[in-house]
């Protein structure tokens, strides 16, 4: 194990092209490993995009910045194969950069990698930060499915409110866990008692409803 200062000096020698070349080497090896999987493995690839905050307490870290929560550090873009949890691409960015910045280029790289591997279907997944409307048509034309969140914009709220009551279905979520022994008595909820005693407004989820409608962003 090298001395920390030696390891840091070695890592700082890597430029962006060096790191991209290293990720490409990993992925070339990954392709060969995947070929050992059964045919069912290649039925579907779920490519997940996420912006991950990497905080630091250092003061001399090159490229760090402060984010909207007041944290110093970096905001890495992580593209992973959700089926296995493998990180396909990790892109370091300054801490104040938005999640979607340069994401489409790396998503396209992940799609190309999965195509080379032989996946028959590809699904992109992520939160609202990755639903970049200028790229959706291209992915759809390319036969790629995507599941992205959409911001609660007024026009979408109006469409949802105008749907007939019969268009909505209750969301059924599986239990978080199964009790393998006898159920135990729940302890007293101290927080709930304080909320009631002080007459705070207590908003609780009663149910979730879902509906589908066609929508094409402009």
Model feature map: region roles:
Residues 67-117:
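Electropositive, glycine- and tryptophan-enriched low-complexity nucleic-acid-binding patches
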Residues 56-62, 88-92, 102, 133-139, ...:
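Short acidic, glycine/serine/threonine-rich loops at helix termini
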Residues 51-54, 61, 84, 94-96, ...:
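Short acidic/polar capping segments at secondary-structure boundaries
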Residues 4-78:
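Active-site-proximal, Lys/Arg-enriched surface segment
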Residues 145-218:
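An anionic, glycine-rich sequence signature occurring as long contiguous blocks
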Residues 99-155:
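Domain-level cores of phosphate- or acyl-group-handling catalytic modules
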Residues 1-29, 81-88, 107, 115, ...:
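Short, positively charged, Gly/Tyr-enriched micro-motifs
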Residues 1-3, 7, 43-53, 85, ...:
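Short, conserved catalytic/metal-binding motifs centered on acidic residues
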